[in-house]
Regions:
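Hydrophobic ligand-binding cavity/cleft-lining segments
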Residues: 1-45
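Hydrophobic pocket/interface hotspot
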Residues: 24, 34, 59, 77, ...
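A short, structured loop/turn motif at beta-sheet edges
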Residues: 21-22, 53-54, 78-85, 107-116
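Short beta-edge strand/loop motif at the mouth of beta-sheet-based domains
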Residues: 12, 32-70, 157
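Short, highly charged C-terminal tails/helix-capping segments
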Residues: 148-157
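Beta-strand/loop substructures that line and gate deep hydrophobic ligand-binding cavities in soluble
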Residues: 87-89, 93-141
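Hydrophobic/aromatic beta-strand elements that line small-molecule binding cavities or substrate pockets
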Residues: 15, 49, 73-79, 102-109
Length: 157
């Protein structure tokens, strides 16, 4: 029998965007808008994914470098407050191996003419396949990509 392990970790990432909370919320809630920033490295291949943005709805996406392994994200939306909060649980797999299970909370606060986003993630990283440092770094990269997507679109988009 192999040795099993779980490592728990919590991290918080904050960003301020020059976009009002409704625009930032839309970037999470609308599949087309989310596809502009919630993405993978350029050299990866991925499926089209699915997104049902409502409490109890699911979102899935998978992909990886050509030739594998395949990384899969599967989430369930637990709580949604329009333009204020999104709470979801998700797990990550690498091929058929579950690597982590997480609870993520996104909070949006007005900040001048923009938005302060606070993302808190509580994760259980399983059997050494993933770690909090890598997840936090990936989250920061995604939130930076969100900022770039918001900055590249006109406010009415």
């Amino acid at each position: 029998m192999s040795t099993r392990s779980v490592t728990h970790s919590t991290f918080v990432v904050e960003r301020v965007y020059d976009a009002d909370p409704a625009r930032v919320f839309h970037a999470f809630a609308d599949p087309e808008a989310k596809s502009r920033w919630f993405t993978h490295p350029d050299d990866w291949v991925s499926d089209a994914g699915t997104m049902d943005f409502r409490v109890g709805g699911r979102e899935t996406v998978s992909g990886g470098p050509k030739g594998g392994p395949v990384h899969s994200f599967s989430s369930i939306y637990q709580d949604i407050v329009l333009n204020e909060r999104i709470v979801y649980t998700y797990d990550m797999h690498m091929d058929d191996i579950r690597t982590s299970v997480s609870l993520a909370t996104i909070e949006l606060f007005p900040s001048g003419a923009g938005t302060r986003l606070v993302m808190t993630e509580q994760g259980a990283f399983l059997d050494g396949y993933d770690d909090a440092g890598s997840r936090e770094e990936g989250t920061k990269l995604l939130l930076d990509a969100l900022g770039a997507a918001l900055a590249s679109e006109p406010a009415g988009a």
